[in-house]
Amino acid sequence: QAMLQELGLAEEDIERLETLPYEALAEAYKKVSPAIQEKGGYVGCVPIPNEYYPGDPRVVGFTPHARTIPVLVGTVIGEMCTFGPGLPDRRTRSREDQLTYLRKFLGDKTEELVPLFEECYPGRPITDLVLLDTFSRVATKDFCRKKAEHAQSATYNYLFTFDFPIDDGTPAWHCADIPFVFHNTDKVPVCNIPGVSDQLEETMSSLFVNFARTGVPTAPGLPQWDPCVPGDLPTMLLDRECKLVHNFDDKLYEAYLPVAVNPKDLHEEEVTMLH
């Protein structure tokens, strides 16, 4: 109703929304949504709970049918936090330079967080700490753990941690795993590292196809992949070398989330991030 009013339309004209340019719809939504949200109204990008859709299973629980369906769910290391320009020379900076950079954003927490990060991601530049996904990883782990309470079907978790050959190496951003899943990295030049990305693509596309066929994510050369069970969240790290880790980043996120950096604050000048 608020959008219709903003656009100068009556309720009986609602079908005209289908004919309007996206830009007009987006501008109307941005204008009216803050006031609606402030009053407790629904603003979001998921279905409104009803008889057909009970709601987020992490909140309302899994339906009897959903408990029987195997699930493969994962995220990428950076998600929304690596859309912006990369940090120059991130792999060649001295450790002291990297620590100085981190202290600008994390202050006294730097000394606590760096060892936790290095335990999770040995060999990575420690500056990647402030690029960690704070949008999807925690919610995904919560979903997996709650789904794993139902033994009728298996739940598998992955984390795509590949570095792309752009801006001195950029950790994977939101949806960066999709070309590997669908075996079409040849159509996305930024994906390609000869002899590396093609092998990872073969592994990832194979495991998804095999999961769709059998309910178990397998691929030649991929380590044994254990499903999630109460108390244990195995996560397959998909990268140059794929490996299975268990409950590996719980302590890191517990310490980092209270001081997590807004990605926009990482850049001294304003940048436009396109998705």
What do the PLM-derived regions correspond to, one by one?
Residues 20-24, 29-33, 105, 120, ...:
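Alpha-helix boundary/capping residues
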Residues 120-122, 126-134, 196-203:
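Contiguous C-terminal substrate-recognition/catalytic subdomains in enzyme active sites
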Residues 1-97, 126-150:
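Substrate-access "cap/lid" subdomains that shape
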Residues 29-31, 114-119, 158-159:
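Short coil/turn segments at secondary-structure boundaries
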